[in-house]
Amino acid sequence: MSDLLNYLQSIAATSEKLLEPENPNAARFTDAVLHTHAITDLIRDTQKEELIAAEFKSLPKDWSERLASENPADYVACIEELLDIYPMQGGREYLETLVEKYNLHMSGIENLENVLLEQKEQLQQLEKRQTDQVSARENILQRETSEIQRLEREIEKVKQLIQS
């Protein structure tokens, strides 16, 4: 009877070992891999680096051009397509929040640029006014100097008349 019990325990231990893989992370299957369009067969025993390369290569060909664009709308469109391929809970709402924040920041930057341009114009007008004021003062000084010189000449003439 004890032999039977030992035999059953041995069978149970062996069956548990057969059910557990030696390396559970050796095979990677994710929903993300299965959703890519370029992969038609299951890829077995891929390494993490290979999995990333397979996902990147499966992206549409125009993505590199769209990601090189400086237009934020292209980035948003790419992210929306990624959310279609790789659904993420709350992903769309988070993207909308980011777009709203971006738009708010951009309008703030545009307002600051407008204020800066107005300030530059006002500064230029002030500098022009100051140069006009300086030249007006110089004109007044020149007139006063010439008037003083004229009066000095007349005084000299009067002195000469008095002396003669």
From Swiss-Prot:
Keyword Kinase: no
Quaternary structure (record): Component of the DASH complex consisting of ask1, dad1, dad2, dad3, dad4, dam1, duo1, dad5, spc19 and spc34, with a stoichiometry of one copy of each subunit per complex. Multiple DASH complexes oligomerize to form a ring that encircles spindle microtubules and organizes the rod-like NDC80 complexes of the outer kinetochore. DASH complex oligomerization strengthens microtubule attachments. On cytoplasmic microtubules, DASH complexes appear to form patches instead of rings.
Superkingdom assignment: Eukaryota
Location (main, coarse): nucleus
Reported function: Component of the DASH complex that connects microtubules with kinetochores and couples microtubule depolymerisation to chromosome movement; it is involved in retrieving kinetochores to the spindle poles before their re-orientation on the spindle in early mitosis and allows microtubule depolymerization to pull chromosomes apart and resist detachment during anaphase.
GO biological process assignments: attachment of spindle microtubules to kinetochore; cell division; mitotic sister chromatid biorientation; protein transport along microtubule to mitotic spindle pole body; spindle attachment to meiosis I kinetochore
A family per Pfam: DASH_Spc34
GO annotations of cellular component type: condensed chromosome, centromeric region; cytosol; DASH complex; kinetochore; mitotic spindle; mitotic spindle pole body; nucleus; spindle microtubule
Record's keyword annotation contains Transport: no
UniProt cross-references to InterPro entries, sorted A to Z: Spc34 (IPR013966)
Protein's name in the database: DASH complex subunit spc34
Mutant phenotype after disruption: Sensitive to thiabendazole and osmotic stress.
Stretches of the chain forming a coiled coil according to its record: 104-164
Family per similarity comment: Belongs to the DASH complex SPC34 family.
UniProt keywords, alphabetically: Cell cycle, Cell division, Centromere, Chromosome, Chromosome partition, Coiled coil, Cytoplasm, Cytoskeleton, Kinetochore, Microtubule, Mitosis, Nucleus
Subcellular location: Nucleus; Cytoplasm, Cytoskeleton, Spindle; Chromosome, Centromere, Kinetochore; Cytoplasm, Cytoskeleton
